[in-house]
Amino acid sequence: MFDHVTIRVSDRAASQRFYDTVLAVLDIEKTYEEDELPEWDDWSLTAAGDGKPVTRRLHVGFPAASRAKVDEFWRIGVDAGYRSDGEPGPRPEYGDDYYGGFLLDPDGNSAEAVHYAEKLRDDGTVDHLWIRVRDVAASKRFYELVAPFGGFEQRFDSPERAMFAGGTGSFSVLSGEPTENVHLAFATDDNATVDTFHAALTEAGYRDDGPPGERPIYHPGYYGAYVLDPDGNSVEIVNHNR
C-alpha cells in the first residue's frame, strides 16, 4: 500500500538499533542505508532537526510469519531493554485470529509484530498504521480526497475510527492526542497524477508542503508533491519514473 513511511527521530543511531534488533526477528532486512536514511522496504527513519521535529504517538504494525515470531519479537525487545507496550497474545477486538505483541521505540512510538492467518504481507514491510487525530471526520474527509490518487479506499467507518486500505496494507485515523510529524507516501505511475493530487488538495484548502516537481536528491526521475493533513502530517504522491 505504502511507497514509504518515514519517521523523524531524536537519536538516529538509537532508533536504528531498536529497529535493527526487532525487525531482524521478523526476517525484515534493511534495504538501504546511505545519507543517514536507513530503510527497511517501505519503512524508514531520519534524524529530526531544526524545523523538522520528532514523530510522536504513531503506531506501526509489522507482519510476523507465526505467533512464535510475535513472541520472539517482544521477548528480544524487552531483553534488550526496550519498553513493552503490550505483551504478546490474542487481540480478538481486531480479529478472531489476530495475535500481536507491542514495544515502544526510543521516542515512544508503538511498534507491533502481528500475525493473522488470512494474509501476510509480501509487498513491503508495513502491515498497518494507526494515526491519532483531533477530528476523525475532518481527517476522513482529507484522506477520502487523497484516496483515488494514492490507490487506496475506505474500508471501515465509525465516529471514532476510519480505516483505509489498499493491497494488503492499511492505515486508520482514530480519535486521540494527535500523531505528529509522520510522513506517508503513496506511489503512482505518472507525473500527471502527482500534479492533479496537489492541485485538488490545495484547491480544497489543505496546506501545501511542497509543489509538484523532480527531487533528484532522492534519485533521478523522482517526481513528487506534498500536502499536510489536518494535523500537520506530510502526505506525498510520488512517481519514481523507473
State what each model feature region is.
Residues 6-45, 130-170:
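Core segments of cupin and vicinal oxygen chelate
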Residues 21-26, 73-80, 145-150, 200-204:
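Generic non-transmembrane alpha-helical segments
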Residues 15-19, 77, 108, 139-143, ...:
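Conserved active-site tyrosine of GNAT-family acetyltransferases
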Residues 1-16, 60, 114-140, 151, ...:
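N-terminal beta-strand motif that seeds the catalytic metal site of vicinal oxygen chelate
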Residues 32, 38-80, 162-203:
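Long, continuous compositionally biased terminal/linker segments
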Residues 78-125, 153, 163, 203-242:
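Vicinal oxygen chelate
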Residues 1, 53-56, 95, 123-125, ...:
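Short glycine-enriched loop/turn motifs at secondary-structure junctions
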